[in-house]
Amino acid sequence: MSMSDPIADMLTRIRNAQMVEKVSVAMPSSKVKVAIAQVLKDEGYIDDFAVKAEGAKSELNIALKYYAGRPVIERLERVSKPGLRVYRGRNDIPQVMNGLGVAIVSTPKGVMTDRKARATGVGGEVICYVA
């Protein structure tokens, strides 16, 4: 059976792993998932990630980050879904928690944060909110 929303699956795996205080979480890899993991790492929400290739299939391993015994990621919410895509122009990209959180946006120039998209002057599909 094929997965209808691999990005939502990735976010759910991260949320579930953090609820049981796992050190890392593994999932099937894709270019978009790796790009999202890179943004999460750059913003300090995860420790690290690695892609392990086994023949035709590859696996993405994400090392989760905790501070004082609590997960660094408090909120991880999917915005644009397969049934309802959410696109925003460069002037309409939302701020998460008045700039304390991050919106991850897929733009023609790659996957980036809301701040970088505004600075670059591009809009795109709002993938998720992270806080």
From Swiss-Prot:
It comes from the Bacteria. The keyword Ion transport does not apply. InterPro entries: Ribosomal_uS8, Ribosomal_uS8_CS, Ribosomal_uS8_sf. One of its GO terms (molecular function) is rRNA binding. Pfam families: Ribosomal_S8. GO terms for cellular component: ribonucleoprotein complex; ribosome. Coiled coil: none annotated. Keywords: Ribonucleoprotein, Ribosomal protein, RNA-binding, rRNA-binding. One of its GO terms (biological process) is translation. Part of the 30S ribosomal subunit. Contacts proteins S5 and S12. One of the primary rRNA binding proteins, it binds directly to 16S rRNA central domain where it helps coordinate assembly of the platform of the 30S subunit. NCBIfam families: PRK00136.1. Belongs to the universal ribosomal protein uS8 family. This is Small ribosomal subunit protein uS8.
